[in-house]
Amino acid sequence: MKSLRHSILLTALALVVTPCLVAAEEHDAIKPVPRQGGWMTRHQSFNKRVAQGNVDLVFIGDSITQGWEGGGKGVWARFYGKRNAVNLGIGGDRTQHVIWRLDHDNVKNISPQAAVVMIGTNNSGSNTPEQIAEGVAVIVKQLRTKLPETKVLLLAVFPRGTD
């Protein structure tokens, strides 16, 4: 009887978990993909910078993060300039692009004290909030695996649209 209960329980669990696993594989927010053109050039420049070492703080994200190089340049210099901070933001990036970049050396051989992550707003036009959260979770997992001593600071996705 105990064996039958275990079999029924395992079958029920499989029926619940399997659709979730299939659904996770169906959306693009978790599938690593590169972009071309200037994006690839910027990605490669990141790899060159981190290869130089001396990285204590890393910012990872999209145009909001990249914006520290434009209008936020003075603030960046004042607060992060002496902190060995590196900006790994690329305008237009979605979770899948950051996943690809992290798999292709953006944080190779560094051990920053903290990684600040803000990504996902560009996914909002084509992914559900749950899918975006899955993409962000993959990024956090990558960082914890590749940078085990680094504190990961996850910032909220800015609200977009009417919903």
What are these regions (language model features)?
Residues R42-Q44, T95-D105:
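A Trp-anchored, charged/polar loop motif used as the substrate-binding/catalytic surface
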Residues K82-G92:
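A short beta-strand-loop structural module common to alpha/beta enzyme folds
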Residues I90-T95, I132:
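Phosphate/oxyanion-binding active-site loops and adjacent basic polyanion-contact surfaces
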Residues M1, V75-N84, W100-D163:
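Alpha-helical cap/lid subdomain in secreted, periplasmic
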Residues M1-I60, I64-R78:
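N-terminal secretory targeting modules
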